[in-house]
Curated annotation (Swiss-Prot):
GO terms for cellular component: cytosol. SUPFAM superfamilies: S-adenosyl-L-methionine-dependent methyltransferases. It comes from Herminiimonas arsenicoxydans. Its EC number is 2.1.1.182. Keywords: Cytoplasm, Methyltransferase, RNA-binding, rRNA processing, S-adenosyl-L-methionine, Transferase. It catalyses: adenosine(1518)/adenosine(1519) in 16S rRNA + 4 S-adenosyl-L-methionine = N(6)-dimethyladenosine(1518)/N(6)-dimethyladenosine(1519) in 16S rRNA + 4 S-adenosyl-L-homocysteine + 4 H(+). NCBIfam families: ksgA. PANTHER family: DIMETHYLADENOSINE TRANSFERASE, DIMETHYLADENOSINE TRANSFERASE-RELATED. Belongs to the class I-like SAM-binding methyltransferase superfamily. rRNA adenine N(6)-methyltransferase family. RsmA subfamily. This is Ribosomal RNA small subunit methyltransferase A. GO terms for molecular function: 16S rRNA (adenine(1518)-N(6)/adenine(1519)-N(6))-dimethyltransferase activity; RNA binding. Pfam families: RrnaAD. SMART domains: rADc (SM00650).
Length: 255
């Protein structure tokens, strides 16, 4: 029986064999990998990953798809977690000593940003992440200071990860086709992020970008004096999108 994609789950199923092949090449699954796929859907990518790994985990919210997966795959090869990825504790997935988790998925575009922040909590225990996301989101993730797309997502994720836009995927590669272009991003956790309290960095970045058209002196008024900004190497007349990650970290360390 054909599964009807559900809007509330943000379901757009990848159906293009060429794109799937390129994703698998980028991931390069190895037999001993501890692999977890978020939102396997109709298992187009799952099947190809299982050709390369001995066993893998999937996290799927749609109960109909969970039942389909259970009927299709050997439970010793595919371990299914019927759960919301936003609430799922990825640390519960057993990983052999000396190994780290590899995370992949065609992420639902309607929850992509909160899901990326949720996964960032697991960064020290992750080898890498390969995700299909809305192209615009990936461009924001990898944006450099001074660009229009540079913002909170850029700063917070670049503090945690080395990131690369691998390639762009057209809407025609999906069923149903989304209204936007998609892209594959590779995320490799930084072993030693710049020393900083994450909560303080979040506070500074959130306040700075809440009024991105203003100069940073006005954005952060009440949090930092003009002298604080200068001592952190920041011209008070700069705008939030021109300030580097290192400069935001320097500010957070002054709180």
């Amino acid at each position: 029986m054909k599964h009807i994609p559900r809007k509330r789950f943000g379901q757009n199923f990848l159906t293009d064999d060429g794109v799937l092949h390129n994703i698998i090449l980028a991931i390069d699954p190895q037999p001993q990998d501890t692999m977890v796929e978020i939102g396997p859907g109709l298992a187009a990518m799952t099947r190809l990953l299982l050709d390369g790994v001995n066993q893998m985990h999937v996290v799927e919210l749609d109960r109909d798809l969970v039942e389909r997966l259970k009927k299709t795959f050997d439970p010793k090869k595919l371990i299914i977690h019927s759960a919301d990825a936003l609430q799922f504790d990825f640390s519960t997935i057993p990983v052999p000593a000396g190994s780290k988790l590899r995370v992949v998925g065609n992420l639902p575009y309607n929850i992509s940003s909160p899901l990326l922040f949720h996964l960032a909590e697991m960064a020290p225990h992750v080898q890498d992440q390969h995700f299909m996301l809305q192209k615009e989101v990936v461009e924001r993730m990898v944006a450099e200071p001074g660009s229009k797309t540079y913002g909170r997502l850029s700063v917070m994720l670049q503090w945690r990860y080395h990131m690369e836009l691998m390639f762009i995927v057209p809407p025609t590669a999906f069923d149903p086709p989304p209204r936007v272009e998609s892209a594959i991003v590779r995320m490799i956790p930084i072993e030693k992020p710049l020393p900083c309290d994450q909560t303080k960095l979040e506070q500074v970045v959130l306040k700075a970008f809440s009024q991105r058209r203003k100069v940073i002196r006005n954005c952060l008024a009440g949090m930092f004096s003009e002298a604080d900004l200068i001592e952190a190497g920041i011209n008070p007349q700069m705008r939030p999108e021109t300030i580097s990650l290192a400069q935001y970290v320097a500010l957070a360390n002054r709180l």
